[in-house]
């Protein structure tokens, strides 16, 4: 089922699809935890499937194809409240490393790769509570992949060791994000 921006449930999984109003995106919910997204000449969008709420110890499995042209990420993506945090465990990305310009805080080895840990800040930007100022936490995988398993606790514990704490978990999805780029992805989450 091809849908417009919004959130809801599809075949037992939570989905979230957001765009900035300038994104040429087609997002489709498939069976189970599957979804597809195609985009071209897009603005900014984030779309994917997972859980609401997420947890701090979930092992997330994902598989499929991811073919970006330009600035795009394939991530475990979510939010917490109190504190308001947007977080990414980046498994793959296109031409732009999302950590560019950020200060590296450390690294963690998990699920067959080293991930570099960063924190960035967003000022007066969209969030799950409306326009707000908040931190973003990042783990960026060095060995890119489009299928695998992610032990989220390894990342959250590593972040906490650097003072990056999460609050009450909100949604947690496997997400494709694009920023003024094009591409296609077909992902299944479990």
From Swiss-Prot:
Catalytic residues (UniProt)? 86, 177
Annotated signal peptide: none
Which residue intervals define the domain GH11 in the entry? Answer: 1-190
Is Hydrolase found in the keyword set? yes
What domain of life is recorded for the organism? Eukaryota
Pathway field of the UniProt record reads: Glycan degradation; xylan degradation
* Family, per entry: Belongs to the glycosyl hydrolase 11 (cellulase G) family.
Name used for this protein in its record: Endo-1,4-beta-xylanase
């Amino acid at each position: 089922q091809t849908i417009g921006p919004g959130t809801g449930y599809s075949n037992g999984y939570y989905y979230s699809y957001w765009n900035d109003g300038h994104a040429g995106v087609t997002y489709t919910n498939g069976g189970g935890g599957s979804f597809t997204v195609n985009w071209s000449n897009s603005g900014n969008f984030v779309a994917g499937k997972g859980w609401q709420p997420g947890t701090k110890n979930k092992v997330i499995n994902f598989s499929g194809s991811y073919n970006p042209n330009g600035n795009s990420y394939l991530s475990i993506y979510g939010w917490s409240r109190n504190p308001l945090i947007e977080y990414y465990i980046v498994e793959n990305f296109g031409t732009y490393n999302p950590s560019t310009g950020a200060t590296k805080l450390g690294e963690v080895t998990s699920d067959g790769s080293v991930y570099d840990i960063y924190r960035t800040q967003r000022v007066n930007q969209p969030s799950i509570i409306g326009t707000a100022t908040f931190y973003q936490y990042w783990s960026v995988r060095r060995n890119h992949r489009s299928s695998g398993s992610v032990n989220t606790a390894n990342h959250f514990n590593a972040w906490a060791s650097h003072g990056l704490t999460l609050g009450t978990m909100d949604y947690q999805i496997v997400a494709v994000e694009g920023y003024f780029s094009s591409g296609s992805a077909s992902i299944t989450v479990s």
